[in-house]
């Protein structure tokens, strides 16, 4: 665990464009003979202003890595920093504030409040925190995600793709340092999934955001700048400028010759029409 002497990130964490990093990150569940080592002394740097995908076979530790980097789960050993803030030693109240103010989240389930309309769902975390959104930034996010004509619609009046766009806007609304997306296209058809991936790509390219996405889909990973491959709780490989075919081939190496998922059209086309 962290010590009082290690409260700052490694030198130049922000200056060198690092949004988050971990050193010797270890996460174990259970004890004794039943111990399961989900993460095994992982070192990782998440580059600021880039789209990073995390992939691996089932049980490889990819979701656990995201949860530990985001402060959603405690670590068994090692250190994690968000920017220049070490989060492994923070109290729960401080972690809650950090997640609220500096991190955005997207999940496979949209987690929208059914009684609120789209814009109310988008601003809800900031409303709860007593913060006012930057209206210029919020307008830019809404227009980038194509939600201008859907702001008064409740979730039941929106398609799955539109609901995930609302969830994406909610993650972006506070202009966070880092967005974590856990299987964000898992509940969507291929067309809606393409749109959401396109919007995450735009969030990085046009809005200057940093995105870390956990996915099992090689096509989804192909929208990223960098893919990190996990196996048995360790980062075992990485791929710059990935394609779906290259990711699929790499995944076969970690899955005993059987790929986790087929390559999908998400890597071959970009979203065009609105839902």
Question: Where do the PLM segments sit?
Answer:
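Pre-NBD coupling/linker segments of ABC/ABC-like ATPases
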Residues: 2-14
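Compact Cys/His-rich metal-coordination microdomains
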Residues: 2-3, 254-259, 271
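ABC family nucleotide-binding domain
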Residues: 17-226, 230
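Conserved beta-strand-loop-alpha-helix hinge in the C-terminal portion
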Residues: 234-257
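Long, low-complexity, intrinsically disordered segments
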Residues: 268-275
């Amino acid at each position: 665990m962290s010590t009082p002497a290690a409260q700052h990130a490694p030198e130049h964490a922000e200056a060198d464009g690092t949004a988050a990093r971990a050193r010797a990150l270890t996460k174990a569940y259970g004890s004794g003979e039943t111990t399961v080592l989900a993460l095994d002394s992982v070192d990782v740097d998440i580059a600021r202003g880039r789209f990073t995908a995390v992939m691996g076979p089932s049980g490889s530790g990819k979701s656990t890595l995201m949860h530990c980097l985001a402060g959603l789960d405690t670590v068994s050993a090692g250190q994690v920093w968000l920017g220049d803030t070490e989060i492994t030693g923070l109290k729960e109240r401080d972690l809650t504030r950090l997640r609220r103010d500096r991190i955005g989240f997207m999940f496979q389930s949209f987690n929208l409040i059914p009684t609120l309309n789209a814009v109310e769902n988008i601003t809800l975390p900031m409303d709860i925190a007593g913060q006012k959104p930057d209206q210029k930034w919020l307008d830019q996010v809404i227009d980038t995600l194509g939600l201008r004509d859907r702001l008064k619609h409740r979730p039941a009046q929106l398609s799955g793709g539109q609901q995930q766009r609302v969830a994406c806007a909610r993650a972006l609304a506070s202009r966070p340092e880092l967005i974590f997306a856990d299987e964000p296209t898992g509940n969507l058809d291929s067309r809606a999934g393409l749109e959401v991936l396109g919007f995450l790509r735009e969030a990085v390219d046009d809005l200057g955001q940093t995105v870390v996405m956990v996915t099992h889909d090689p096509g989804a990973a192909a929208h990223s700048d960098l893919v990190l491959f996990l196996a048995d709780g360790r980062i075992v490989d990485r791929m710059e400028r990935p394609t779906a075919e290259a990711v699929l081939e790499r995944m076969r190496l970690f899955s005993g010759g059987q790929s986790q998922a087929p390559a999908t059209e998400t890597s071959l086309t970009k979203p065009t029409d609105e839902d």
